[in-house]
Protein backbone atom coordinates (compact mmCIF):
# COMPACT_ATOMS: atom_id res chain seq x y z
CA UNK A 1 0.00 0.00 0.00
CA UNK A 2 1.26 3.47 -0.85
CA UNK A 3 2.24 5.65 2.13
CA UNK A 4 0.27 8.64 0.87
CA UNK A 5 -3.02 6.72 0.74
CA UNK A 6 -5.66 8.50 2.83
CA UNK A 7 -7.41 6.38 5.44
CA UNK A 8 -10.33 7.24 7.71
CA UNK A 9 -9.73 6.40 11.36
CA UNK A 10 -12.33 6.45 14.16
CA UNK A 11 -11.62 6.77 17.88
CA UNK A 12 -14.04 4.27 19.40
CA UNK A 13 -12.65 4.78 22.90
CA UNK A 14 -14.55 6.68 25.60
CA UNK A 15 -11.69 9.11 26.08
CA UNK A 16 -9.18 10.99 23.99
CA UNK A 17 -6.44 9.19 22.09
CA UNK A 18 -3.19 11.09 21.62
CA UNK A 19 0.01 9.97 19.94
CA UNK A 20 3.29 11.52 18.83
CA UNK A 21 5.35 10.34 15.86
CA UNK A 22 8.87 11.78 16.08
CA UNK A 23 9.81 10.52 12.58
CA UNK A 24 7.15 12.77 11.06
CA UNK A 25 8.58 16.05 12.39
CA UNK A 26 7.14 15.45 15.85
CA UNK A 27 3.58 14.99 14.59
CA UNK A 28 1.08 15.04 17.46
CA UNK A 29 -2.41 13.76 16.73
CA UNK A 30 -5.37 13.99 19.11
CA UNK A 31 -8.64 12.13 18.61
CA UNK A 32 -11.62 13.01 20.80
CA UNK A 33 -14.09 10.24 21.67
CA UNK A 34 -16.04 9.25 18.56
CA UNK A 35 -14.03 11.53 16.26
CA UNK A 36 -13.14 10.47 12.71
CA UNK A 37 -9.99 11.80 11.05
CA UNK A 38 -8.34 11.14 7.72
CA UNK A 39 -4.67 10.23 8.01
CA UNK A 40 -2.08 8.70 5.68
CA UNK A 41 -1.14 5.05 5.64
CA UNK A 42 2.44 6.14 6.34
CA UNK A 43 1.32 7.77 9.60
CA UNK A 44 -0.48 4.62 10.73
CA UNK A 45 2.49 2.49 9.75
CA UNK A 46 4.86 4.67 11.79
CA UNK A 47 2.38 4.64 14.67
CA UNK A 48 2.53 0.85 14.66
CA UNK A 49 6.31 0.99 15.22
CA UNK A 50 6.29 3.19 18.31
CA UNK A 51 5.73 1.72 21.80
CA UNK A 52 2.00 1.39 22.47
CA UNK A 53 1.10 2.18 18.87
CA UNK A 54 -0.16 -1.30 18.04
CA UNK A 55 -2.31 -1.24 21.17
CA UNK A 56 -3.87 2.03 20.03
CA UNK A 57 -4.51 0.61 16.55
CA UNK A 58 -6.03 -2.63 17.85
CA UNK A 59 -8.02 -1.39 20.83
CA UNK A 60 -8.83 2.31 20.53
CA UNK A 61 -8.69 3.34 16.89
CA UNK A 62 -10.63 1.71 14.06
CA UNK A 63 -9.51 1.83 10.45
CA UNK A 64 -12.68 2.42 8.44
CA UNK A 65 -13.45 1.02 4.99
CA UNK A 66 -9.92 -0.13 4.10
CA UNK A 67 -9.38 -3.88 4.48
CA UNK A 68 -6.00 -3.70 2.77
CA UNK A 69 -4.66 -1.25 5.38
CA UNK A 70 -6.09 -3.37 8.21
CA UNK A 71 -4.46 -6.47 6.76
CA UNK A 72 -1.05 -4.83 6.33
CA UNK A 73 -0.99 -3.15 9.73
CA UNK A 74 -2.77 -5.63 11.97
CA UNK A 75 -2.83 -8.91 10.06
CA UNK A 76 -5.90 -11.00 10.78
CA UNK A 77 -8.58 -9.26 12.84
CA UNK A 78 -11.85 -10.63 14.13
CA UNK A 79 -15.09 -9.14 12.74
CA UNK A 80 -15.66 -7.40 16.09
CA UNK A 81 -12.63 -5.15 15.39
CA UNK A 82 -14.74 -2.94 13.13
CA UNK A 83 -17.69 -2.58 15.54
CA UNK A 84 -18.68 1.03 16.08
CA UNK A 85 -20.64 2.42 19.03
CA UNK A 86 -23.91 1.99 17.08
CA UNK A 87 -23.04 -1.61 16.17
CA UNK A 88 -22.43 -2.40 19.83
CA UNK A 89 -25.68 -0.74 20.93
CA UNK A 90 -27.57 -2.74 18.29
CA UNK A 91 -25.90 -5.96 19.42
CA UNK A 92 -26.73 -5.25 23.05
CA UNK A 93 -30.37 -4.40 22.35
CA UNK A 94 -31.23 -6.73 19.45
CA UNK A 95 -28.46 -9.32 19.05
CA UNK A 96 -28.74 -12.92 20.16
CA UNK A 97 -26.96 -14.12 23.28
CA UNK A 98 -24.62 -16.23 21.11
CA UNK A 99 -23.59 -13.20 19.04
CA UNK A 100 -23.03 -11.24 22.23
CA UNK A 101 -20.90 -14.02 23.76
CA UNK A 102 -18.78 -14.17 20.58
CA UNK A 103 -18.27 -10.44 20.85
CA UNK A 104 -17.15 -10.74 24.47
CA UNK A 105 -14.77 -13.58 23.57
CA UNK A 106 -13.17 -12.15 20.42
CA UNK A 107 -13.54 -8.36 20.48
CA UNK A 108 -10.53 -6.14 21.14
CA UNK A 109 -10.27 -4.46 24.53
CA UNK A 110 -11.65 -1.17 23.22
CA UNK A 111 -14.92 -2.87 22.26
CA UNK A 112 -15.26 -4.63 25.62
CA UNK A 113 -14.59 -1.35 27.44
CA UNK A 114 -17.34 0.27 25.39
CA UNK A 115 -19.68 -2.62 26.23
CA UNK A 116 -19.08 -2.00 29.95
CA UNK A 117 -19.81 1.71 29.58
CA UNK A 118 -22.90 1.25 27.42
CA UNK A 119 -24.33 -1.51 29.64
CA UNK A 120 -24.67 1.11 32.39
CA UNK A 121 -25.63 4.09 30.20
CA UNK A 122 -28.39 2.38 28.18
CA UNK A 123 -28.95 0.45 30.63
CA UNK A 124 -28.73 -3.15 29.41
CA UNK A 125 -32.01 -4.84 30.34
CA UNK A 126 -31.17 -8.40 29.24
CA UNK A 127 -30.27 -10.32 32.40
CA UNK A 128 -28.48 -13.07 30.46
CA UNK A 129 -26.24 -10.49 28.78
CA UNK A 130 -25.56 -8.79 32.12
CA UNK A 131 -24.52 -12.15 33.54
CA UNK A 132 -22.32 -12.81 30.49
CA UNK A 133 -20.55 -9.49 31.02
CA UNK A 134 -19.92 -10.42 34.64
CA UNK A 135 -18.66 -13.92 33.76
CA UNK A 136 -16.42 -12.84 30.86
CA UNK A 137 -15.23 -9.39 31.97
CA UNK A 138 -15.69 -9.45 35.74
CA UNK A 139 -17.84 -6.31 35.54
CA UNK A 140 -21.05 -6.28 37.59
CA UNK A 141 -23.56 -4.21 35.63
CA UNK A 142 -26.17 -4.31 38.42
CA UNK A 143 -23.77 -2.84 40.97
CA UNK A 144 -22.53 -0.19 38.53
CA UNK A 145 -26.11 0.96 37.81
CA UNK A 146 -26.91 1.02 41.54
CA UNK A 147 -23.80 3.07 42.32
CA UNK A 148 -24.56 5.49 39.48
CA UNK A 149 -28.12 6.01 40.79
CA UNK A 150 -26.86 6.58 44.32
CA UNK A 151 -24.33 9.13 43.08
CA UNK A 152 -27.05 11.00 41.18
CA UNK A 153 -29.33 11.31 44.21
CA UNK A 154 -29.04 14.60 46.07
CA UNK A 155 -27.27 14.39 49.39
CA UNK A 156 -29.72 14.92 52.21
CA UNK A 157 -28.48 16.94 55.10
CA UNK A 158 -29.26 15.46 58.47
CA UNK A 159 -31.36 17.78 60.61
CA UNK A 160 -30.14 18.57 64.08
CA UNK A 161 -31.94 16.37 66.56
CA UNK A 162 -34.42 18.12 68.82
CA UNK A 163 -34.95 17.31 72.47
CA UNK A 164 -38.06 15.35 73.17
CA UNK A 165 -38.19 16.32 76.83
CA UNK A 166 -37.83 19.93 77.88
CA UNK A 167 -36.34 20.48 81.33
CA UNK A 168 -36.64 23.91 82.75
Where do the PLM segments sit?
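Compact, well-ordered interaction domains used in eukaryotic information-processing assemblies
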Residues: 1-79
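Charge/polar-rich, low-complexity and marginally structured segments
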Residues: 81-168
Amino acid sequence: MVGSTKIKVLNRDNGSVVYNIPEMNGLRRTFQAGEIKTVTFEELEKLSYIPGGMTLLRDCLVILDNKEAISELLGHVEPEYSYTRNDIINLMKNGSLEEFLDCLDFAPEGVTDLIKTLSVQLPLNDVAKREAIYQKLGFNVDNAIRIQKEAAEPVQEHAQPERRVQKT
